[in-house]
A protein has these predicted regions:
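ATP-binding/phosphotransfer module of carbohydrate and carboxylate kinases, centering on a glycine-rich
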Residues: 1-67, 79, 105, 124-132, ...
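Long C-terminal interaction/binding lobes of large macromolecular proteins
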Residues: 70
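Short loop/turn segments at strand-loop or loop-helix junctions that form parts
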Residues: 73
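Phosphate-binding/catalytic loop of phosphoryl-transfer enzymes
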Residues: 76-187
Length: 320
């Protein structure tokens, strides 16, 4: 019988669930749909979590789950939302086949912890709830927390408004290629890359594609990869878009760093999300400015798997 914990990362695009042993080793992994309560309904959230958890345990029957931690996008610091999500997880775990995997005396109030997704990303990178995490994926947010409980958040307003996000990079790219086409009738190298990805024949088709009902926010945000590729090939417009994104993200990081007291020991900065982990121009600009201008930041860590932070927190709530 393996004694384990469940770590869950419920985002706006997908849900990831991992099963880990007492030493943090991941022995099972599952995935489901989005779990952000601001974007999908309660039944959809339950379905996503149920699918992800079932994928983890179905091939590992000899289990004893000691604790669960879920980092959920859209929950924030709201105790009401956290409690609602805890209830959903308990509804899943308290029915077969899940219930048979829980340790005797499992208490949902004590053994199921729900936090914001920013918290698990911070812990995954820094190893504790002390430091700053900057996340840039479809949306963006910067969050700081100290061991004394001081907490500061900048951004996280939603993908329509978040600066330095994948969606914002994609939106700026679309404006750039449409403006160039209006002024000169030119299909720029960046425009051609977008047309290829979206399988369009002309820049004239771009606006219709953007506003059709089947186009998702992630379709726009994923253009950040195209902008990064174009910038790497020397496209100046793409480079400028990425510089602007880096500047906006750094401003948010700086705002948090200057409002929070990390003491003499300072803190780590954790960089997470597809833009910060995969777009080198953005990351390198931020890293350089942080090292020069923010002495409270003693180290910079990349976080590619926030769910590992959920495992760390679950282990703290377990008897392992």
């Amino acid at each position: 019988m393996k004694r384990c914990v469940l770590g869950i990362d419920g985002g706006g695009t997908k849900t990831v669930c991992v099963l880990a042993t007492s030493d943090g080793k991941v022995i099972g992994r599952g995935s489901g749909g989005p779990a952000n309560p601001n974007l999908v309904s309660a039944p959809e959230i339950k379905e996503a979590l149920q699918k992800a958890i079932l994928e983890v345990i179905r091939n590992l029957p000899e289990l004893q789950i000691e604790a669960v931690c879920a980092g959920i996008a859209g929950v924030g610091a709201s105790e009401e939302k956290q409690a609602a999500m805890r209830n959903v997880i308990w509804q899943i775990l308290s029915t077969p086949p899940f219930y048979n995997t829980l340790r005797k005396g499992f208490n949902p109030t004590k053994n199921i912890e729900v936090v914001s997704d920013v918290v698990i990303a911070l812990v995954a990178g820094a190893g504790e709830r002390h430091g700053i995490v900057a996340i840039s994926g479809t949306g963006s947010v910067v969050y700081g927390e100290t061991v004394k409980g001081q907490k500061i958040k900048v951004g996280g307003w939603g993908y329509h408004l978040d600066e330095g996000s994948g969606y914002e990079i994609g939106r700026m790219a679309l404006k750039e290629i449409l403006k160039a086409y209006d002024v000169s009738g030119e299909t720029t190298p960046l425009a051609q890359k977008v047309l290829n990805v979206w399988n369009l024949s002309s820049v004239r088709d771009v606006v219709n594609y953007i506003y059709q009902k089947t186009t998702k926010p992630t379709d726009i945000a994923n253009l950040a990869k195209i902008v990064n590729s174009a910038a790497g090939a020397g496209d100046e417009a793409s480079k400028e878009i990425l510089r602007k994104a880096a500047s906006d993200l750094y401003s948010d990081i700086s705002a948090v760093a200057k409002q929070i007291d990390f003491g003499k020991e300072g803190a780590a900065l954790v960089l997470s999300g597809g833009v910060l982990t995969n777009v080198e121009i953005v990351r390198e600009i931020i890293v350089e400015k942080v090292r020069v201008e923010l002495p409270a930041i003693k180290s910079i860590q990349l976080c590619r798997e926030p769910v590992k932070g959920a495992v760390v927190l679950a282990l703290k709530n377990s008897t392992l």
